[in-house]
């Protein structure tokens, strides 16, 4: 099976999830109803759109541009919904209505991931589609940065939607979003965030215990989880931002990876296979070998 065939299948599956809802711009996490993943998560949608943006960069195909525009219009719509936790609301129904059932909210990685993505979109569209950028991209970014800065010191739920407190993953993507805002501040953005960013980087060091990265603290400051797949995802999703690597060298991520591999080899008798899940003793659907 060649790589081009695999890539085509992956893209096809992405497009199925993008085109599932009648409301353009909605991206389902999965067509599954059990577990119930047929929702538009702010986090998941932003990560899916990273792939679409990359495809547009490579191909300049109109369909990918249309996916991007649909996504932008939908996110602008979602930002204005009357939801329980505002921009920290983790997901919405695929018909565009708020999801108001009990859930782990707020989840403050979502707006940051969306913001990181939108700066990528900003950079690739600003010359060819300046009106689109000014009318859609910039206002979404501004609302997200205002929310993130206002809530930096407040606890939230982690990306696994289980722990309420402070989380390595959430804080890293927030830091990356703020850094991107600062990098673009000489153009259209003017909020002064340099000192906020520098202080936030200092606070990130709370997640270091020697060479070990602490994934989550509860609201009392107690360590809740250490070896967690979200630590590895954090490095990927901030695109190995150098300011972050200066604090958390990749050798520290390697320690987390090695511990996870060891734990899952023991759990599933994997011998030499390097397959991991979210974290050791994960009980959700028996804690299988997966993470976002």
Task: Identify the role of each PLM range.
Residues 133-138, 142, 153-169, 213-219:
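Short, surface-exposed recognition loops or helix-turn segments adjacent to catalytic cores
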